[in-house]
C-alpha cells in the first residue's frame, strides 16, 4: 500500500474520531538526523493514548536519537475507523514525525507489551505493505525486531519477526544500531545482516529454531539450526543509573492514559510472588540513586510542565530511598502544586508518613493488592502480607482523609477453593469497616478482580487456567457477597483472560489462528468495545485449533514452547518454588535476607543494587519537610493573553487546549496562582470553547500570576516558545475588570464547492427565516433547540466563502458554525466535514 498523503492533514483528520491521535508535534521532540546512517521506526501496537503512556518506548526513542548517525521516529496503531479510511484511500502507515512510510526504514522496533495486542501487529504490518511472515519479506523490507514483556514467550508470533530482543533494551539498541550501520557499509544482503544480529547479547533469531510435535500436540523436540545457541539468554541492564535520557520527556498534546512525568526509581522485584512473571524477568532489584531521581524529576517537570510525578517500580514502596526521596520531592514541588503518585504500593510499605507526604498537594490514588482473600492462599502465592497489615493501612488512609481505597484480587490461583472466594468478600467487608473511623464523608472501596493467567518462567507456569465458565461462576459468587452500596466490584472480562491464557503459553501453531482471526475482523482485543470472542472461536474452528489445549496443566518434564528462552533464573528454582507453594513455605526477599539461589546473580556484573540495605523500607524515619514559602502574602497579577491557533493542532478538543496552556505557563516560568482544596488547579480562565477543527486568529485567556511581568514582550516571546506548533501568542496585556464571556464571534467559512443559486438565495433571505430547530442528544435524551436567534448575520465573501456571525452567551446553549451553516443550507455530512472554518474576530455583546 503506497502512501498517497500524510495522515495528519485536513483531508484525513476531520473524518476520524479523536484526531489528536494522529497529529504528533509533541513538545520536546528531539532533533532528528535526517541523514542518519541507521533509521528506526519504533512501533507501539496499540492506540496512541496507550503507546504514549509506555515508558519503555520513550526511553528507547531518546537513547536512539541521542546517538550519532542514528535516527528514530514513532508509529502507533490506528483505530478501526482510521484504518478503514486509510484502506479506502490507499494511505500507507507512516511515522508521526516525518510521515515516512514504515517500509522505508532500516529497522522496525515493535514493542510486545501484552498478548491481546497481537492482531494490532498484523494491522500495522499490513498497512505498511509488509508480508506477515519474516521468511517471505522482500530484500528491501526493513528488519523487524520485537521486544518487551511478551518476548519471554514470543513463539505464537515468532515467525512475524526477523529478531526478538529478550530482556532490557537500553544498551542493546545502541549495539544493534552500530552493528547495522557497519554491516550496511559492507553492502551485505538482508538475510546476512539478520544473522549477524545474534552477536548482540539477548537477540533471538526465530528462524534458527524449529519445533516438532508428538501425536498429543505436545512439543517433541526443538531443533536448533544454523549453529544457533541452544538457549538465548536475556539481556540485563546491570545498573539503572546508566540510563538518564528522559530529562526532556515528550509532552503529548492529545490526552493519554498516563498523562504525567514518570520516573523509574527501581527495576526488578524479589518479593517472590509465585504468579508474577515480572518478578522473574526483571530481577535483580536495581535501584536508582536519590540524586538521579531528584535530577530526573526536576529536569522533567521543568521541561514538561506536568503537574504530577509518578514514581515507577514494580513495588515503589520497596524502594529503599523512598523515605529520603519523597519529602525532598514534596519540598521542591509542593508550592508549584506538583503532586507525587505511587501507583504500585505493597501492603505494609504504605505508611502513615508516606501518606502524609502524598496528600500535601492532592490525594493521588493508590491500589493495594492483597491478591488473595485468605491467609492460606496468600501463603501459597508467597504474598507475605497479613490481614492485619491491610486493615491497618486502610484505617490510616481513611484517617488521613482518603475516601476511596482500591483493592485488587485474583481468582483461579492454584489450590483456590470456594472458601477462598468468600474470604475475599470478608476481607473487603473488614476494610469497609475500617472506614468507620474519622470523618470526611462516606468511605468507598473499589474492588478489581482478574482471572489468574499462568505465565511462562514462573513457579506457576505449569498450572491449569480456569475456563470461562469457572471464572464466571466464581465472580458470580463474589458478586453475591459484595452488595454494600459503598463497595464497587469491577472485573476483567473472563473471555479476554481466556484468550490471553491461550497466547501466553502458546506455540507457533497459533500464528495461523492469529492471521485468520485478523482476517475475520479481530482488532484491538484488549479494548472491551472491540473484543469479540466468537470471532476467535469461529476462526479456531475454521483452522482446527483446540484453544483449551493451551490452558491445560503441564508436566514439569514437558518441553515448553519457551524452554529455549533463558530468563537466567534456573528452572530448578521455579520447581522448588512450586513445591514450596504446596507446603505453604515462605521464601524471603533476597534484598534483605540471604541469597535464595535463583541462579541469576554472578555478583560481579549482575547483582542487586539497593542503596539502604540495613533495614527494609520504609522503616527508616521520614523527615517531614514543609515547602519553603516564598511570601506569606499573596500578590495577584491578572493578564489577558491573546493567541492564534492554526493548522492541524485545531483538531484537538477544548480540554486538551486547556491542558496545553496549563503546561506551557510553568515551562515559560510564568507561575499562576492555584485554587484551594483537595485538587488545586491553576487560576486560568478561557473564552468560549472552539469546536474541534476550527482555527482562530483571535483566541484569549486570562491568568492570575504570582509575580508581575516587567517586560510584556519578553513574556510573550518565552511563552510563545513554550507552545507547540500551531499556537502563537499575539499579545499579553494587563487585565482590568472581568473576562468577556458574552460576545458576537465572526467566522470565515470555506466550502468545498462554489455556492449554488439556491444556497445564495437562502443566505440572502436569512431575515425571513423565523426558526431553525436542531435536535441534540444529551445523556440519552433528545432535546430540541432553535438556533436561529444565535445567528446574528451571514454574508457571502467569495464564490465559496461565507462570513458568519454567531452569538455566544455563557449562560445559554450555543451553536457551532458548522451546525448553523449545515442547518441553514441543508449540507450533507461529508460536506460539513470538509468545511474549513476560521474565527477571525469577536466583539463584546451589548446587553
Where would I find each of the regions flagged by the language model?
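Radical SAM enzyme core and accessory elements
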Residues: 2-29, 36, 40-42, 484-630
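N-terminal [4Fe-4S]-dependent radical SAM core
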Residues: 11-41, 48-49, 206, 212-262, ...
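N-terminal pre-triad scaffold of radical SAM enzymes
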Residues: 42-46, 64, 251-275, 301, ...
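Conserved SAM/AdoMet-binding glycine-rich loop
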Residues: 42-44, 299-406, 410-449, 454
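Glycine-rich beta-alpha loop elements in corrinoid/cobalamin-binding modules
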Residues: 78-223, 459-507, 515-529
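Canonical Radical SAM [4Fe-4S] cluster-binding loop centered on the CxxxCxxC motif
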Residues: 255-291, 597-610
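Short, charge-patterned binding micro-sites
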Residues: 451-459, 672-706
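Core RNA-modification/binding signature centered on pseudouridine synthases
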Residues: 633-636, 657-659, 768-847
